[in-house]
Amino acid sequence: DVELTPDMVMTVYGSQEGMGHLGMALCDEGDVVLLPDPCYPVFAAGSLMAGAKPYYYPLVAEHDFLPYVKDIPEEVARKARYMVVSLPSNPVGSIATPGIYEEIVEFARKYDILIIHDNAYSDIIYDGAHGGSFLAVPGAREVGVEFFSLSKSFNVTGARISFLVGRPDVIAALRKLRSQIDFGMFLPIQKAAIAALNGPLESVQEQCNMNQERRDALCNGLREIGWDLPNGKGTMFVWARIPGGRTDSMAFCMELMEKAGVIVTPGASFGPHGEGYVRFALVLPPDKIREVIDAIRRSGI
């Protein structure tokens, strides 16, 4: 559990909007921000518009696609304004492992860095693993804030219902910026969100189970046709290395679409370290996913 006071909570129109505006609220021109690579593109948007300089820390298979703060140069860390972390992670599908948040908190304390944690997929974690909040880790409330979203957990993507919790000074900075942009979330939507959070949560687990069945069908199928072990421990996405040693993800995606009729997202669209990978979205039922696997197999790609 995480204890919060009112000055540690605010609503936002989706974590994407909140993330973009938070970068604008916190950054000055020339500030350094630490961003994952690969990452969801909006992580960079607000800071770039504010004139900040991104330093991309790699998420690689050797470290299970998790942040490895020991590889961030000290001269970069000393200049950093904040670090964005996202677990479970879109696009790479990794989830927090024991000790990872503690390492990040220690790193943040050492270099006086704010941690912005995107927890939009907190309820979509597979194989009996548990998510929870970054802020539950001792010391995290002093160094971080965290975005939560109802979009994925409750299947209300278009409603744009999210909230930011954590350090009061960061909440105040974003609230000040947004006070000049909008007048808050539509009240009926807020009441619907309250009802969802306080109501029965069986549907959240049912949706997670549904996504896990899709994940299993996709990952098992890809392995059967010769792909490397895909990464899909959480989120509604699976991150997979392109087979055959191919590295041009855009060219592969175009060929896959033309020859198999299958559309996936090129890894390079999420950053340089995404090259050589593709992202699958778990948007089809298992029987359709098996048809997709068969189409890929028959294409000969």
Regions found by a protein language model. Give the residues of each.
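PLP-dependent class I/II
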Residues: 1-301
